């Protein structure tokens, strides 16, 4: 396959001629410091546009400069030092994995050399020589699924354009870094003057992918019997790479897979849809279901033919429909933990609705609360956590007790002492995670908590949901009939660097608890904040629509969301974000 982009490398000058190499680091500029230690905390690791566009001999080319490369090396070294200090230099093992981005090999190589010099055993996913590819969700979950490896680095920039790359890392738990620990690592990365490397490292192969697929098969068997996708022709289009883990899983479950081996930049199925290609492949192969995947497999879309018509579904629609079908048709009790700007069309069928800030650093706190697992105070302080009480009012929480009391009362009221609850944790951008929870000590509030027979994953892990919704579609369920189709949910962005993001949020804060008028339409404004009262999300609610906006944690932009009338939502969203951009930026 022809490469979508190619890039050139600047030469890196190392010192030393023995077994090890040393790199002297230049002083950081202010802009570089912000990239490593951003004002707006990232929702999931760091992402940096690693390739710069330059003009050379009259042609535009992409260049990986030393200064951009060195930012990644600083963060690798900081993670290594932090983990080494936490573990007192013992049991130093790391799994390093990547997606299929053009810069994957150079980052994998240098990352491995840095950790090898610091005394770590280096593990790779079984792959072609010199590669270690696995999906980001599988990489994150491996910290819970692999017995002896408690540090994972995933090199990915998710759905971002291919000139980007990034670092997600997991220590002990499959939950994104946040709070004090993330800050400590950023501070370390800022202060290095040199980094040492061991080029003679020998990675140890391990099949984390199979461990993950075994886990998925075991987990979904507690929700539904997978029977209707057997011998079903499924089209899978990974927008980058070959999605080996997901393809292998569906084949194991009996599906007949047609793989579209054609890459798209940016690798984002929510923004890029090639309907003509999909229809042509589906018609020629006799397939009715196509699965579209982003670069790191945590953002999915579906293209489905039912009743002679093709429909395209985005994550908000997929997950709301899945939850509604499981609740209505299969009598599952859903503990619905969702980010505030995600789809509200599954709320009515849920056992309880719990709303959080955007990202799994918020969602994961709720899971640990329910399981009685201690959560670092700095994580709770930075988390935005609410639940709906019996009157559908949002109650803010900074500890597990009020939420436990609400669930305890609901279980008592409905006599659900033996129920296996399906907890779903999901976000509007595509992340989804589910688990099975059992109530423990449900006759006494003091001993009440939840337990699970499955490993606890508190980061995005959408493959179980993907298998379940595919099975339900194969059984004849229709997404469009399982949610209120008169409502449409979508998001848009306006460009804004960190300082501009903060300015917009600060300027708009004066409208909290007020009603404002935008083009003859009234909106009630509510500010939603974390547990140290930093506002992270604004809600604007009219008589027939709900909008949100917040500073992005993954790029230089402010994100706007709307749930409104299918016919007018796009125009309404455009009016609102133009108004806010004009008056508050």
What are these regions (language model features)?
Residues 3-40, 49, 163-282, 385-387:
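Gly/Ser/Thr-enriched, mixed-charge loops and adjacent short helices
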Residues 89-100, 233-237, 333-342, 423:
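Short glycine-rich phosphate-binding loop at a beta-alpha junction
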Residues 173-200, 315-349, 462-466:
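Glycine-rich phosphate-binding loop plus the immediately following alpha-helix
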Residues 31-53, 70-84, 103-113:
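N-terminal glycine-rich anion-binding loops that anchor highly charged ligand groups
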Residues 162-190, 300-319, 438-454, 458, ...:
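A short, gly/pro- and small-residue-rich
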Residues 287-289, 293-295, 303, 309-310, ...:
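Phosphate-binding and adjacent anionic-ligand microenvironments
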Residues 73-95, 220-231:
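Glycine-rich phosphate/diphosphate-binding loops that line cofactor/substrate pockets in enzymes
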Residues 93-164, 246-304, 380-399:
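N-terminal small/polar loop signature for handling phosphorylated ligands or for N-terminal nucleophile
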């Amino acid at each position: 396959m022809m490469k979508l982009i190619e890039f050139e490398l600047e030469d890196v000058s190392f010192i030393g001629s023995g077994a090890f190499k040393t790199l002297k680091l230049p002083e950081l500029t202010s802009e570089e410091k912000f990239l490593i230690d951003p004002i707006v905390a990232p929702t999931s690791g760091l992402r940096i546009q690693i390739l710069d566009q330059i003009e050379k001999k009259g042609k535009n080319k992409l260049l990986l400069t030393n200064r951009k490369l060195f930012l990644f090396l600083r963060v690798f070294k900081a993670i290594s030092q932090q983990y080494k200090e936490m573990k007192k230099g013992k049991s130093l093992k790391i799994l390093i994995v990547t997606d299929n981005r053009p810069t994957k090999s150079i980052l994998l190589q240098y990352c491995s050399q840095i950790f090898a010099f610091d005394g770590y055993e280096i593990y790779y996913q079984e792959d072609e020589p010199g590669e270690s590819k696995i999906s980001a969700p599988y990489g994150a979950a491996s910290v819970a699924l692999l017995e002896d490896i408690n540090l994972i680095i995933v090199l990915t920039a998710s759905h971002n354009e291919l000139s980007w790359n990034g670092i997600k890392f997991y220590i002990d738990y499959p939950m994104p870094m946040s709070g004090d620990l993330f800050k400590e690592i950023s501070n370390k990365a800022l202060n290095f003057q040199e980094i040492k490397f061991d080029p003679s490292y020998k990675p140890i192969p391990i099949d984390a992918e199979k461990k993950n697929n075994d886990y998925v098969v075991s987990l979904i068997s507690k929700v539904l019997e997978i029977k209707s996708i057997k011998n079903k022709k499924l089209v899978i289009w990974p927008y980058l790479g070959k999605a080996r883990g997901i393809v292998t899983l569906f084949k194991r479950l009996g599906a007949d897979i047609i793989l579209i081996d054609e890459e798209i930049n940016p690798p984002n199925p929510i923004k890029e849809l090639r309907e003509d290609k999909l229809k042509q492949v589906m018609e020629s192969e006799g397939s009715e279901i196509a699965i579209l995947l982003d670069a790191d497999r945590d953002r999915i879309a579906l293209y489905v033919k039912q009743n002679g018509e093709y429909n395209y579904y985005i994550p908000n629609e997929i997950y709301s429909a899945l939850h509604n079908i499981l609740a209505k048709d299969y009598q599952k009790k859903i503990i619905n933990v969702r980010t505030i700007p995600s789809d509200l069309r599954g709320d009515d069928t849920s056992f309880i609705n719990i709303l959080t800030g955007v990202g799994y650093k918020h969602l994961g706190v709720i899971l640990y609360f329910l399981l009685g697992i201690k959560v670092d105070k700095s994580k709770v302080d930075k988390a935005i956590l609410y639940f709906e009480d019996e009157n559908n009012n949002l109650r803010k929480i900074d500890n597990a007790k009020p939420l436990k009391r609400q669930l305890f009362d609901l279980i008592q009221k409905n006599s659900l002492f033996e129920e296996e609850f399906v907890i779903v944790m999901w976000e509007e951008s595509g992340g989804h995670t589910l688990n099975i929870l059992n109530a423990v000590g449900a006759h006494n509030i003091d001993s009440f908590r939840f337990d699970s027979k499955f490993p606890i994953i508190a980061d995005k892990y959408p493959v179980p949901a993907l298998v379940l919704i595919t099975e339900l579609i194969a059984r004849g369920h229709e997404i469009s009939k399982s949610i209120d189709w008169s409502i449409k949910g979508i998001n848009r962005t306006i460009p804004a660097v960190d300082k501009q993001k903060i300015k917009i949020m600060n300027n708009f804060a004066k409208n909290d608890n007020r009603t404002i008028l935008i083009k003859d339409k009234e909106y009630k404004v509510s500010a939603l904040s974390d547990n140290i009262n930093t506002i992270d999300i604004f809600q604007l609610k009219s008589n027939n629509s709900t909008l949100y906006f917040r500073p992005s944690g993954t790029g230089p932009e402010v994100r706007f969301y709307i749930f409104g009338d299918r016919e007018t939502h796009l125009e309404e969203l455009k009016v609102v974000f133009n108004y806010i951009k004009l008056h508050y930026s």
